[in-house]
UniProtKB/Swiss-Prot annotation:
Residues 1-26 form the signal peptide. GO terms for cellular component: cell outer membrane; type II protein secretion system complex; type III protein secretion system complex. The keyword Protein transport applies. The keyword Ubl conjugation does not apply. The gene is sctC. Coiled coil: none annotated. Induction: The SctC complex is found in cells grown at 37 degrees Celsius, but not in cells grown at 23 degrees Celsius. Detectable in cells grown in the presence of Ca(2+), although less abundantly than in cells grown under Ca(2+) depletion. This is Type 3 secretion system secretin. It holds the Pfam family Secretin_N.
């Protein structure tokens, strides 16, 4: 039971205290400093606090987590003493915002990290003090840059601090926009892509970010917006400098469009220049070879020992059939040099002609360094999936897929290619079916990271595969007669065991096929091109044809040297044999005193 105050005394003190407390901080109660007495007998603490506020004509908001019972007599000279006493007894924390008294449990005290972009922590503190929200009892810890503030306190106090910070940021931002000018600049890209690139394979997709997206992530913590460029929706974000600052990608120009303050433009230029760098071109050829397990010795390969390469280095190739070696070493791959690979492929071609080997697939993929590339040759069949009330078709995809991300590692004059490889090879087993006649799919997945030296190839193998083929032979007409026809039919089953090899041949492409054709002596290569079985940088026949076309008369070779010099490239001549005379071949490279007919590239700035 509470004892109320005299109404006249209350009105006189109220007007006086309101004048004195207009600039006070939030920790002081601006209530009448008159005694408060309350006697409780097993009453709810919530009711006690609500009655306490009503006695002073004030609104009190009590947390739902306060559900204690109170017994005893409370006598205090002023309301703040009573509040401090009851808070220490029942582990409470209170906060007064000037109008409403909020009371919480100590366990409800939380922390917030406030990020400031336009203003500083000192400005936020001054704004809180001016508005009467500031409470020194609660935590306040800014960082050295004055842009991050760690605040702790009851929920209502944290809400007011965050609202004040947001209002201050908006006010500072509007003020800077009215006084600061904006500039617009276009930065064209030569090598990198301005917009994002999406790679689709099977049911997945991977987004390769462009330069615009990278800049947005680095320069901005703002919410991503959508900006339309050439009828394409491109994610954009406001930079930290201003809400009007934008970084946009223009796919038609392959350029970055920046709108921001002029003093920030050099920073954008430095970042874009650092990101717009040329990348090496890398070609990867994948050969999938099946070899009859009974004919492995025809390859000249001891699968438990290795391959003798051209440099007499022994290369061990582990297989799934060699359980002891796999258990001890755990490796399924190896590296071979060019001579060892040529020997292996020659034996594979011989076995293929005899029907004991088969090159299942040989895709070739060209990509840039650090750019993911995918080649997928697959088939899809659909299976009906029936539920309780619905039915749908589910696609089952299988085939050959090569996904890779290459990277060139250079140490001095030595170069290596780091390959992040994902190879998936699947096929439908013949004469096999599972539940409800659904065919069985055999799938082999290789996911690895390998470092391959210049001129080397990676062999991953061997994976044993058992194939069952069923053949039916019969006498015409007689074999179709019911019952009796069984005497004129014969069903035979043949089990064939093969070893599957994955041969990966990476290669750094300097100029490509078009460069070799441009350096030719003008002879007609159309007839020779028709005899080439494969148009790629991996084709031996094509390389021989192009190598012969480079041998030309001296005057033609000097014209090529002149053209190279105009393109800032040095070159020298070496002798070669033409049909009926000696010729000259142009070789790109730096000039040395020992080389003849050498033309150096002109120095920059010198005509």
């Amino acid at each position: 039971m509470a004892f109320p105050l005299h109404s006249f005394f209350k009105r006189v003190l109220t007007g006086t205290l309101l004048l004195l407390s207009s600039y006070s901080w939030a920790q002081e109660l601006d209530w009448l400093p008159i005694p408060y007495v309350y006697v409780a007998k097993g009453e709810s603490l919530r009711d006690l606090l609500t009655d306490f506020g009503a006695n002073y004509d004030a609104t009190v908001v009590v947390s739902d987590k306060i559900n204690d019972k109170v017994s005893g007599q409370f006598e205090h000279d002023n309301p703040q003493d009573f509040l401090q006493h009851i808070a220490s007894l029942y582990n409470l924390v209170w906060y007064y915002d000037g109008n409403v008294l909020y009371i919480f449990k100590n366990s409800e005290v939380a922390s917030r990290l406030i990020r400031l972009q336009e203003s500083e922590a000192a400005e936020l503190k001054q704004a809180l003090q001016r508005s009467g929200i500031w409470e020194p009892r609660f935590g306040w810890r800014p960082d050295a840059s004055n842009r991050l503030v760690y605040v702790s306190g009851p929920p209502r106090y944290l809400e007011l601090v965050e609202q004040t910070a947001a209002a201050l940021e908006q006010q500072t931002q509007i003020r800077s926009e009215k006084t600061g000018a904006l500039a617009i600049e276009i930065f064209p890209l030569k090598y990198a892509s301005a917009s994002d690139r999406t790679i689709h394979y099977r049911d997945d997709e991977v987004a390769a970010p462009g330069v615009a997206t990278i800049l947005q992530r680095v320069l901005s913590d703002a919410t991503i917006q959508q900006v339309t460029v050439d009828n394409q929706r491109i994610p954009q974000a406001a930079t930290r400098a201003s809400a009007q600052a934008r970084v946009e990608a223009d796919p038609s120009l392959n350029a970055i469009i920046v709108r921001d303050s002029p003093e920030r433009m050099p920073m954008y230029q430095r970042l874009i220049h650092a990101l717009d760098k040329p990348s090496a071109r890398i070609e990867v050829a994948l050969s999938i070879v099946d070899i009859n397990a009974d004919q492995l010795t025809e390859l000249g390969v001891d699968w438990r020992v290795g391959i003798r390469t051209g440099n007499n280095h022994q290369v061990v190739i582990k297989t799934t059939g060699d359980q002891s070696n796999i258990a001890s070493n755990g490796a399924l791959g190896s590296l071979v040099d060019a001579r060892g690979l040529d020997y292996l492929l020659a034996r594979v071609n011989l076995l293929e002609n005899e029907g004991s080997a088969q090159v299942v697939s040989r895709p070739t993929l060209l990509t840039q360094e650090n750019a993911q590339a995918v080649i997928d040759h697959s088939e899809t069949y659909y299976v009906k999936v029936t539920g309780k009330e619905v039915a749908e078709l589910k696609g089952i995809t299988y085939g050959t897929m090569l996904r890779m991300t290459p990277r060139v590692l250079t140490q001095g004059d030595k170069s290596e290619i780091s390959l992040n490889l994902h190879i998936e090879d699947g096929n439908q087993k013949p004469n096999s079916s599972g539940i409800e006649g659904i065919p069985t799919i055999s799938r082999t997945v290789v996911d690895t990271v390998a470092r391959v030296g210049h001129g080397q190839s990676l062999i991953i193998g061997g994976i044993y595969r058992d194939e069952l083929s069923v053949a039916l032979s019969k006498v015409p007409l007689l074999g179709d007669i019911p019952y009796i026809g069984a005497l004129f039919r014969r069903k035979s089953e043949l089990t064939r065991r093969t070893v599957r090899l994955f041969i990966i041949e990476p290669r750094i492409i300097d100029e490509g096929i078009a460069h070799h054709l441009a350096l030719g002596n003008g002879q007609d290569l159309r007839t020779g091109i028709l005899t080439v079985d494969e148009i790629s940088n991996q084709s031996t026949t094509l390389n021989k044809l192009l190598g012969g076309s480079q041998c030309q008369p001296l005057n033609k070779a000097q014209e090529v040297q002149k053209w190279l010099s105009q393109n800032n490239k040095s070159s020298y001549l070496t002798q070669c044999k033409m049909d009926k005379s000696l010729g000259w071949r142009v070789v790109e490279g730096a000039c040395t005193p020992a080389q003849s007919w050498c033309v150096s590239a002109p120095k920059r700035g010198v005509l």
